[in-house]
C-alpha cells in the first residue's frame, strides 16, 4: 500500500467518507479521512465506528487534550511524520502522552524519567504527574527538576513525607561481586539491607543511578538485570565481528555503559536499555567516560588522546601526548617493586632470582642475563650484591652445589639492588648503544630450598621507553623463565592464571592449585595472542633456538607476536598478585605498547581533562590542547575521582593517603589552576581502596578494604559516619552514592512539612 497516495487523497478530499473535527481549549482542526484507515490504525476509532452512535455519522466532533498533537497522530496513520508544533521536548512529551492516553494507545513512559523541564514549566509537570500517579520514578523526576525557589508547601503532606523518605533511602550502595548492600538512612543510623544477590558465575559491575538496574558480566556475556527481566547486551555470537571484550567502563553517574572490543566501541544507555552509539576504533590502550556519559576520551596506539562526542561521534579534540613537552617521560619506570607474601610462596623456592635485561635497538633482540644468588645464611652477602664483579662470575652463581648450603629457617626483608650497574647493552654487531631503553623481568628459578624474602626493591634509572617501541622480528622465548609459561601446561602442580579486573586497567596474576582447565593465555589476557597458546610446544622447545637465530627462517618467526613481561606485587589482604606492567605488540603494526596501571584519565568538565601517569597529575585543556598545570606527587596514584560539580578532585596514593585538590575556574568553567586544599592522613585509621563523591561534591565515601564504609565531610574536614560491613571475605567492586543528597533540600522539605502541619494540625 502506498501511504503517500492515501495522504494525497485525504488532502484533496478524494474517496473520503468521514470528517473528524478536533477541538481543544484554543484550537479547532477539520480533517477529511477514510474510515477504513482510521479503523485499522487505532482501537479508539474501531470501537467508535462500530459500537457507538457515531457509527452512522459522517461527521464526528472530538474534544481532545491537544488538537495539534492529535492532528499529527492521525496523519501518522497515513505514514506521515508531521510536526505541527514548536513545543520544547518536555512539553511535547507531556502533551503527546495525554493524547495517546485519550486514544488508548501505548507510549514509552520511561522517557518521563529523563525529562528536563524549565523552571516556568514545573507546575505543568506537577499537574501531569498528579494525573498519571506518583511512584518512585515520578518523584525522582520531581527531584531532578525542582526549582531552587519553589514553594514546597504547595505539595501535599503525603508527597512531602514520601519525598523526604525517598531522599534518604539508598544513600550509599556497596557493590560486591555478587550482591548489592544498601545502606539506608546512612546519616541517622546503620541499617543494612541486601538486594540483588546473584548466585551464579556473573559478577556485578555496577548499579544504575536510580538503583533499579544492575549490569553484570560473566567473562563472555554482559547483561542488564531489572526486576525479573534480563537483557543481554553482548555475547560471543552477537559481537563476533567486534572481537573479544577488552575493557568495560561506565560514566560516573552510572547511567552510561561503555564496552571496548578489539575493533569497536559500543555505548549503552542503561536507564532505557538502548544502544546509543557504536563506532569502530583503532587499537586503544585506555579510555574514560565523562560524568554524564556525553563524552569519551581514549588513547590509541600512537599515543593520541582523542576526545569524542558519543552521540554525534564528532571528534572534539585530538592531542598527541608525546608532543606535549611537559610529558617527556610518559613511559618511565622509575621504580619497580616485587613484594611476596610468605604464605603464598609455600611451594615456590625463591633464594635464586634471575634478572634479565632486554632491548630493541634494531631488528634483533639481544639478551644479557645475570643471575644473583642470595645466600641468606650470611647477611653480609647482601651487601655483595652491589659489587659488579659478582655479575661476571656466572659460573659460580649457577653452581648448583652452592645452593645446598642455604638455610631454610632464615627470613630477611627488603632485599634491595640498584640496576644502574647493568648498563651494558649490545646489538648483534657488538655496538654499544647510548640511551637505549630497557625493561626488566624478575623470575624465580627452581632450587632445593625455600627462603622467605618479603620484598625485593629494584631502583631502575629513569628512561623514556617511547623510543624503544620499534618493530621486532622475534623474541627468544626460551630465555623467558616466567611463571606465565605454566599456562600452557594445565598439569602443572602450581599454575598461574591472568584475569582482567573490569573496574580498572590493572590485571591480576593469581596462583591456583591444580589445573587451569586448559584456559588459553590469549583468553586470559583478552588480547590477540593465539600464537603463544597454539604453539606453546614450539615456543618452549629449546631445540628450536637455532631456527630463531637464523634470519632465513623468517617465516617461522610468527610464533612470538607478543612479548609479555611481569612484575608482580602482592595485595596482602586479598592474596592477589598485581600485574604492574605488561608490554605487547599490535599484530598489525608490530609495535610495542606499554600498559601502565597507574595511567588514568578523567573529565573534570567539558573543557578540561585530568591525566595521571604514575606520580604525575596533568591538567589538560581540551580546547587549546595544552597542559594547564602539572603536579608531581610523592607516590604513585592508585585511584582518583573528580567532583561532579567540577570544583575538586580526590586521589589516593600507594600509601593510602587521600589528597583533595581544590580547582579554581573562571566564569566560563575553564580551569585556572589547582591547589592542594588538604590531605587526609587515613593510613592509621583504615585503608581506603575505593572512593566516591556525593553528587553535590560535599561528601566522600571511602572503602576500608572491604571492612567498613567511611563518610568524610569535605566542608567540615571530618569523618561523619562509619558503617561496619562485616564482609571481610568480599571484594568491593564499586560504591554508588545517592545522586540527590543535599542538606539544604532536606531542610526545605522539613520546613514545608512543619508549615503544613501547623496550618492543618489534624
UniProtKB/Swiss-Prot annotation:
All copies of domain BTB, residue ranges: 16-86
Bias-annotated ranges (Low complexity): 532-543
Gene3D superfamilies, alphabetized: Potassium Channel Kv1.1, Chain A (3.30.710.10)
Region Disordered: start-end pairs: 390-411, 532-556
Coiled-coil ranges (or none): 737-762
Top-rank lineage group of the source organism: Viruses
Keywords: Coiled coil
SUPFAM superfamilies cross-referenced by the UniProt entry: POZ domain (SSF54695), Quinoprotein alcohol dehydrogenase-like (SSF50998)
Spans traversing the lipid bilayer: none
Compositional bias segments (type: Acidic residues): 390-410
CDD domains (alphabetical): BTB_POZ_ZBTB_KLHL-like
Family, per entry: Belongs to the mimivirus BTB/WD family.
Name by which UniProt lists this protein: Putative BTB/POZ domain-containing protein L272
